[in-house]
Curated annotation (Swiss-Prot):
InterPro entries: Nucleotide-bd_a/b_plait_sf (IPR012677), Ribosomal_eS24 (IPR001976), Ribosomal_uL23/eL15/eS24_sf (IPR012678). Keywords: Ribonucleoprotein, Ribosomal protein. One of its GO terms (biological process) is translation. The keyword Ribosomal protein applies. Pfam families: Ribosomal_S24e. One of its GO terms (molecular function) is structural constituent of ribosome. The keyword Ribonucleoprotein applies. This is Small ribosomal subunit protein eS24. Belongs to the eukaryotic ribosomal protein eS24 family. It comes from Methanococcoides burtonii (strain DSM 6242 / NBRC 107633 / OCM 468 / ACE-M). One of its GO terms (cellular component) is ribosome. It comes from the Archaea. The gene is rps24e.
């Protein structure tokens, strides 16, 4: 999967970066977790601070566009984001257990 960042805007009021991007991929549409992981690696931020707000596939093509928010700290993220968005973007239990064991 290749991700091309279209816009990276700093939102100082909410202590976050807002990123608009295009993604191209082969095969099936990647999972939200895969996209978040790739964005976190590209921007050199922890996966837990990346909120994938929108990820829409382009009909008939192996491409998608999306919108993500990267917070500076988890406390601010929990204050700003709605509960369902946090739940949609939380890590699976296996991932959390692995990180705690390291």
């Amino acid at each position: 999967m290749d991700i091309n960042i279209i816009e990276d805007k700093n939102n100082a009021l909410l202590n976050r970066h807002e990123v608009k991007f295009d993604a191209t991929f082969k095969g099936s549409t990647p999972s939200r977790l895969d996209v978040r992981g790739k964005l976190a690696a590209m921007l050199n931020v922890p996966l837990e601070l990346v909120i994938l707000q929108k990820f829409e596939n382009t009909y008939g093509m192996s491409a998608a566009n999306g919108y993500a928010k990267i917070y500076e700290d988890a406390a601010r993220m929990k204050v700003v984001e709605k509960e369902y968005v946090l739940k949609r973007n939380e890590l699976p239990e296996a991932e959390v257990v692995e990180e705690a064991g390291e």
